[in-house]
Amino acid sequence: LTVIGRDPIVGQKRIMTEARFMTKAAAGPLPDLWNDAHAADLDEPGLLLYRSNLLGSDLRITNFGGGNTSAKLTMTDPLTRKPVTVLWVKGSGGDLGSMKRDGFSTLYLDKLESLKQLYRGIAHEDEMVALFNHCTFNLNPRATSIDTALHGFVPHPHVDHVHADAVIAIAACSNAEELTEKVFGGAIGFLPWQRPGFDLGLKLGAMAAEHPEYVGVVLGGHGLFTWGPTSKAAYQTTLRIIQQAADWLAGHEKQPAFGGPRRDAAAPETRRAVAAALMPLIRGKISRDERKVGHFTDAPEVLEFVNSRALDRLAPLGTSCPDHFLRTKIRPLVLPYDRQGDNVDTLANSLDALLAAYRDDYSAYYQRCKRPNSPDMRDPNAVIYLVPGIGMFSFAKDKATARIASEFYVNAINVMRGASGVSAYVGLPEQEAFDIEYWLLEEAKLQRMPKAESLAGRIAYVTGAAGGIGGATALRLLGDGACVVLADIDHAALDARIQAVVQKFGRDSAVGIPLDVTDEASVVASFQESILAYGGIDIVVSNAGIASASPVEDTSLALWQKNMDVLATGYFLVAREAFRLMQRQQCGGAIVFVASKNGLAASVGASAYCAAKASEIHLARCLALEGAPHGIRVNTVNPDAVLRGSKIWAGEWRQQRAASNKVSEDELEEVYRQRSLLKLSVLPEDIAEGVYFFASDLSAKSTGNILNVDAGNAQAFTR
């Protein structure tokens, strides 16, 4: 097992297996993580939350955001002070593995039951969702899920609904009902595919009532419902049924999987190199209207599928479970790298035609299936890109969405593997898939989402990110929605910085990459790592720095060269790689140099530093000329005397400057404050604001410019 992800409330990890259907031993049995000692201290809602977090902690049980749980509990009515039965059910949105107690909606069960009298038939079932609000218990603001009726009408106290790959594999077979009987021996019922809603809730409730011997029901093409008398019993039943399905599949699937390999996977380094070459090209071509962020995986199950004989047959069939194609679109785009001689340039030259063909196909699908009240067609570009020999890319509005889409398509691969191994895999009918994708209730959910932040979909690369200015800049860009690559030569400081950033913004928001800007190979490698992490780069902030002070007669060649290596050559190497990438990506870009007042104003005893900083400023001007035809803007922010949080000012440079000004180190910041025209201290956050201005569309018509952030220094006035 490979452990990834997060800690639910009892410290369990989210788990993903690399081969769920190979053998029971290979996949490993689902662990029963229920802890009686922990559970003993919980009330009934707490037990429901505990069960939910446990189920959501394992991707074999349910995917991110998928599934829901419920409990029918006796509570005191706040108006009558009498006991009433209340349905606690996971609300709309959220994720079982990470949800909190406020993630449940609560409804009077008798009021929910009374809605049956108002139901006008399947053509009108969407109107029932609004009526759920009239059943709310205790003014709970949590929006109710479309699956509420499926939980409420099952006549059992505790109900689980999950999207386990092993069960969906059976549910997506052409003979799913027959296999359900064969696998579970009459303990589990079967309902054919139907869009979730009030009507399916009535059918599920009726089946559970008519068959007291059932402990659950398989929903065709969708997933599993199970139930029990207690939270623990329901949880253990869910585990047992999923394990039973996985064991049966492992014992009956045909070998080799997917008809065997059509080709071998490329070597790992080749896969990474090809991915780094292709992802910016794709990203640029699909980001014309909205910037996309990418995700790359070459996990074993992905390689098995993209390299298989069954790829061309199965990929066009689309996914089955609604949760899958809501994230991944109905089908992926296969990029025929293997049929073009494993040649990246050949594939790159055909990308425009391949992407256009996918968009045309998606548009035709929309036109075939749309209804009079369907929402307008959404982005017609693919989300999932399969590359034989290489792996899978996914692109979406942000990193988390792209990663989760990738995880969902891995779920779909597992389902196709299991179903095709024991029967024939069947995707959802096209019209059914469309009706889910363009469901008015789903559209309403999209419309409720907050407006995107100003840097949403942008990817920034910041050097010197472990220091004061670099760290503040990273936080500023992250705060406005960018994904950020934090690069620094100080591994320990970088690790501490990235941990703090991830703690605040989440694991998809940022990556840390060790970088020596004076080492060409290190710079090139850091850009490849950045592409593999996010698919490209839009914003580059060159901020890596050193500082030195020495009279010219005492300045050694080594000291001179060190300043030039870091502050001139380092900025050149980063800018060159940025230009190469941004030109391939073809959607412009913003490069910001963090230089210094000393690049404009001469300073006694710091000739090497001043000359190197002047080099940065003029290099930026030259790059602005070269970048303009490509939409690449290059600007400079000039700080002065930013002491707080600075690694540069923490060492000899501070001592030297204090000695030069004939004050103590503690008095130095006040000296600089009084020296400024505005009598203000300049902080890292002030520089970050300047960088943000040049990185964002606020300065869309600005290039080749210098912004002094120094509280006013007449020597540095640009002329």
Name the predicted role of every residue range.
Residues E553, A601-S607, P629, K679, ...:
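Active-site loop immediately N-terminal to the catalytic Tyr-X3-Lys motif
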Residues V541, A628, R633, S702-G704:
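Short, small/polar-rich loop/turn modules that mediate ligand/substrate recognition or access, typified
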Residues S596:
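Residue(s) in the substrate-gating loop at a strand-loop-helix junction
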Residues R580, L625-E626, A700:
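Alpha-helical segment proximal to the catalytic Tyr-Lys
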Residues A575, A612, A620:
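Active-site helix of classical SDR
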Residues A601, V691, T703-R719:
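Short C-terminal tail/terminal secondary-structure segment
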